[in-house]
């Protein structure tokens, strides 16, 4: 998915699921409507390994909706990273992981630096400002 607004809406819960997902033609499995491609899989196994989950899947349907891939710049992945860091703020704060929490805020600010220095896209700049603003509210 090359649409940051999808990630923003999911993380900040600012939209309904209406229009965000669509069903495939072959299986009643939803996928993100704006995805360039998607793979539908059958879950073969799911296990916890060292505090992480390991899923083994078998592809059952591959759909390519856009034949020409979109190009990326550093801003897009930096915003996605910032969203991931943002989702860790509450758990780190709750668990009183002070050192990790401080590092998390530093990483968020680094993501902001990357976005500001790699794009002039107004939408991307607004997204990173929103993430930082919300993060600082959580810190307070």
Task: Please provide the spans of the model-predicted regions.
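Basic, polyanion-binding surface patches
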Residues: 1-38, 42-140
